[in-house]
Amino acid sequence: MTITLTENKRKSMEKLSIDGVISALAFDQRGALKRMMAQHQTKEPTVEQIEELKSLVSEELTPFASSILLDPEYGLPASRVRSEEAGLLLAYEKTGYDATTTSRLPDCLDVWSAKRIKEAGAEAVKFLLYYDIDGDQDVNEQKKAYIERIGSECRAEDIPFYLEILTYDEKIADNASPEFAKVKAHKVNEAMKVFSKERFGVDVLKVEVPVNMKFVEGFADGEILFTKEEAAQAFRDQEASTDLPYIYLSAGVSAKLFQDTLVFAAESGAKFNGVLCGRATWAGSVKVYIEEGPQAAREWLRTEGFKNIDELNKVLDKTASPWTEKM
């Protein structure tokens, strides 16, 4: 099935990609970034620090990315110093979720809308949804209705809608556990099937790889839960679960593991259309920024940060498929 795009959405998608491949830098982290910064200083990270670090990353690394994903809370200064060639996605969700309940309900930023995100110069709206396909069905209906609203907003504004799905299990506390690893492919691939339906108005899915590679033979240091063939099957099932373009998130893994995973995904038959890669690219700059200041962080981004993004781009050249084949 080929999906048709409006003229405006197509132009926006082209601005966000290079030759149909989305090699985007993700820096819409808020809660996670504050926690990373807090590891290296005793005082609470300030707004100025967060804005400055985001701006440094944007300025130094967007010349090598097709686009950057930022948040409207701390990322607007960073959006203004990005490379002229780079597209912009803005996050529409509040950071984090209520940990006192298993429902992880979505919530939009109070003073933002798809219209305002477009007015801020973004080529796309990104929204993050936590989803457990086997979870409370009333909760899931609420989530589906929420995504329908955002899809309708994006249609009305004629702006691409990137839906990020982070899966979980209401009964498993730790997503890094072997217990979750065993159900991850089911969680990821079934959620993709749901939100690929036309009613949700999603243009691109931003998703997890369907396997925790740390438990795959040849990748695992410890316990092996999956053979390479079983892992490859999970990627093939993922490819079959949607007609939409989909891109991978790096989920905080190391740059090397993420790159190796992309090669494995492509060899397995996943026709993914790029990445939105965050911490795997810039994580090391946080400590340097706090301990040695902005100039040292800039230097780190120009060397280590550049190396990470350059290596990732080379891997993408060999592994990613253009979204234009699907739309």
UniProtKB/Swiss-Prot annotation:
PANTHER family: SULFOFRUCTOSEPHOSPHATE ALDOLASE (PTHR39340:SF1)
Reactions listed under catalytic activity: D-tagatofuranose 1,6-bisphosphate = D-glyceraldehyde 3-phosphate + dihydroxyacetone phosphate
Keyword tRNA-binding: no
Pathway: Carbohydrate metabolism; D-tagatose 6-phosphate degradation; D-glyceraldehyde 3-phosphate and glycerone phosphate from D-tagatose 6-phosphate: step 2/2
Top-rank taxon: Bacteria
This protein's name: Tagatose 1,6-diphosphate aldolase 2
Family: Belongs to the aldolase LacD family.
GO MF term (any one): tagatose-bisphosphate aldolase activity
InterPro entries: Aldolase_TIM, DeoC/FbaB/LacD_aldolase, LacD_aldolase, Tag_1.6-dipho_adolase
UniProt keyword list: Lactose metabolism, Lyase
Gene3D superfamilies per UniProt: Aldolase class I (3.20.20.70)
Enzyme Commission code(s) on record: 4.1.2.40
Signal peptide: none
First-level EC class: lyase
GO terms of biological process kind: 6-sulfoquinovose(1-) catabolic process; D-tagatose 6-phosphate catabolic process; lactose catabolic process via tagatose-6-phosphate
